[in-house]
Amino acid sequence: MRLNLCFLLALLPLWHSTAANAAINVGATRVIYDGANNETNLTVSNREDTSPYLVQSWVSRFGSSNQDSVEEFIVTPPLFRLDANKENILRIIFMGGKDVPQDRESLYLMNVKAIPAMSDDQKDKNVLQIALKTSIKLFYRPAGLKGSLKEAVAQVGWRAQTGTLAFNNASRLHVVISQLKLNGQLVPNAPEVLRPGEAGQLPVPAKAGDTLSLSYIDDYGSVVAAPVVHID
């Protein structure tokens, strides 16, 4: 991003740039949507002392190149002005959908894009406005889905398979990995998320009896160390 921006500014020396850096704060690192509820909320605040922002919000699919809004959720208000030192509450409403499974968790992205307003002295100039987007995970848990995230982590199976490390998430929840170690060594290219029912192999030489330690991110955004296991 920095290289691209520097290149762009080198081509446009008369332009100025402004960015919605840390001024716009999203009040959570993830959203857990309980399907038993009609909606869930997310707070967005503007920490700037003077500058307002135009804020756009929507839900998209996790892991997809298409980041357009999905039909399963609506966010209100989808577009609004957020003045300095103010906050607004986004209402996230599940609209349903035939492709949303009711026997396991589904994962989406909650997106918040902030565009800074022009100051009075910028209005008569060529100004490059930079919109920054924050995306956090949104987990939809159908009503009545049983089991905790701690139990889900315990249901992830690990075993040595022909010189690789095989895994199988037998739970109905997503397991977000913070760190994965085999015999005390970091596993390179470990998956970010183990989806419900997902199985696969990691190109790591493993053998039965090796120790595996997993740290995962819980519903509150905290990193939790799971008990060390010996792989089969």
Model-derived features with residue positions:
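Bacterial N-terminal signal peptides that target proteins for export
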Residues: M1-F7
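N-terminal signal peptide c-region/cleavage motif recognized by signal peptidases
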Residues: W15-A19
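Beta-sheet-dominated interaction scaffolds and their linkers
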Residues: N21-S45, G147-G157, P191
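Short, solvent-exposed loop/turn segments enriched in Ser/Thr/Gly
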Residues: A36-N41, D103-L107, Q161
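Short edge beta-strand/loop segments characteristic of extracellular beta-sandwich folds
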Residues: N41-S45, T164-A170
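Short acidic, flexible loop segments centered on an aromatic residue
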Residues: E48-N66, A170-V187
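Intrinsically disordered, low-complexity Pro/Gly/Ser/Thr-rich segments with frequent PxxP/GP/PP motifs
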Residues: S65-K98, Q185-T211
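Terminal connector regions
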Residues: G96-L145, D210-D232
